[in-house]
Structure formats: structure tokens, C-alpha cells
Swiss-Prot record:
The gene is gmhA. The lineage of its organism: Bacteria, Pseudomonadati, Pseudomonadota, Betaproteobacteria, Rhodocyclales. The reaction produces a racemic mixture of D-glycero-alpha-D-manno-heptose 7-phosphate and D-glycero-beta-D-manno-heptose 7-phosphate. Its cofactor is Zn(2+). It is found in: Cytoplasm. Belongs to the SIS family. GmhA subfamily. This is Phosphoheptose isomerase. Zn(2+) binds at residues 60, 64, 174, 182. It catalyses: 2 D-sedoheptulose 7-phosphate = D-glycero-alpha-D-manno-heptose 7-phosphate + D-glycero-beta-D-manno-heptose 7-phosphate. Residues 36-197 form the SIS domain.
Length: 197
């Protein structure tokens, strides 16, 4: 095996996946940017959740909004529901791991807030439960998935936004997810700050 060739193929495959995704995802990403910006401008907040690498993505996104992305601006209201180990373990222990995000959504979510629900397969039970809780709280949902969207794609309401990566390989989906999150951050900043370029 030639490691250099293998690494080169990884880069090429990643680039091709991203280029193929833009045709499907640019318009819904723009819709998600507008939804999130409208919520933030109306004193709403964004709650984000996911498992494993998607949990890291939820935290990354919340950090970019709370601190800053590439432009100076005031902090924005975003909370990753993946970070409080006492809350996560108490819910998982006393109830069920399926409820680790939904209980937080029911406690923190308000009408007009946005839930960013991340699942590469679209089938994560605790993310599905969080979406159901968000709907109960009259929140908007932006779902970031892959592999056809799974059960999440089937349960979204017409007012939700589905950002589904047209790929089946988890690593490639995660790479497009990160780029998508950066596009969301950039778009929110541009709308809030009136950037025209």
C-alpha cells in the first residue's frame, strides 16, 4: 500500500463530495441562515445536539456563535446540549439516554428558538426525541444529516430545514457537516453585520 496515494485519494474524495453537495445544499443552507438569524434577532437562541463527532460539531458551532467566527461581533445565544456531563449522566441514569437532549430542549427551548439537530445517519434516537420536543415547544428545526436523511428526514415539518449531505460514507458526511456549519456561521454574521460581498 502506498500511503501517499491513499492520502491523496482521501483529499480528492473529500473535495468531490463537497462539490457534489453544494448543488443540493446551497439553497437550504441559505434558508437555515435566514431562519437562525431571524431567531437571534428576535431574542431567540440556538440549541445544538448530536452524538460522537456530531456532538463535537454541535459544540464547535455553539462556540463560534458565542465567541466569534471570522468577524468581530457581539456574542450570540447558542447552547450545545452535549457539554454538561452532570445533566447528561443524570438523565441517562434516571430515565434513558434517548432523553438526554429532549429534556434539555423542554427546559430551555422557547417558541421561535432553533434546534440544530445533527446526525450523520438521520437515525439517532436521542436526536429524534429532541426534534419531537422542539416541535412541542414550537421551535424551528435545522436538521443536518446524511445517508438519505433517515427517520429524521421523514419527521421534519414543512417549516423545518433539512440539510442532507448526498453521501453514504460517514467521514465524508462529517466533512461536509463541518463546512456547512462554517457556512451557517458566515451567513449569520453577514446578515447581522450587513456584509454585502
Amino acid at each position: 500500500m502506498d500511503l501517499i496515494d491513499r492520502i491523496s485519494r482521501q483529499f480528492e474524495d473529500s473535495a468531490q463530495t463537497k462539490l457534489a453537495a453544494v448543488e443540493w445544499m446551497a439553497a437550504p443552507i441559505a434558508q437555515a441562515v435566514e431562519m437562525m438569524t431571524a431567531s437571534l434577532m428576535n431574542n431567540g437562541k440556538i440549541l445544538a445536539c448530536g452524538n460522537g463527532g456530531s456532538a463535537a460539531d454541535a459544540q464547535h458551532f455553539a462556540a463560534e456563535l458565542l465567541n466569534r467566527f471570522e468577524m468581530e461581533r457581539p456574542p450570540l445565544a447558542a447552547v450545545a446540549l452535549t457539554t454538561d456531563t452532570s445533566t447528561l449522566t443524570s438523565i441517562a441514569n434516571d430515565y434513558d439516554f434517548v432523553q438526554v437532549f429532549s429534556k434539555q430542549v423542554r427546559a430551555l427551548g422557547q417558541p421561535g428558538d432553533v434546534l440544530l439537530a445533527i446526525s450523520t445517519s438521520g437515525n439517532s434516537p436521542n436526536v429524534i426525541d429532541a426534534i419531537q420536543a422542539a416541535h412541542e415547544r414550537e421551535m424551528h428545526v435545522v436538521a443536518l444529516t446524511g445517508k438519505g436523511g433517515g427517520r429524521i428526514g421523514e419527521m421534519l415539518s414543512p417549516t423545518d430545514v433539512h440539510l442532507c449531505v448526498p453521501a453514504d460514507r460517514t467521514a465524508r458526511i462529517q466533512e461536509v457537516h463541518l463546512l456547512t456549519l462554517h457556512c451557517l456561521c458566515d451567513g449569520i454574521d453577514c446578515l447581522l453585520l450587513g456584509v454585502e460581498e
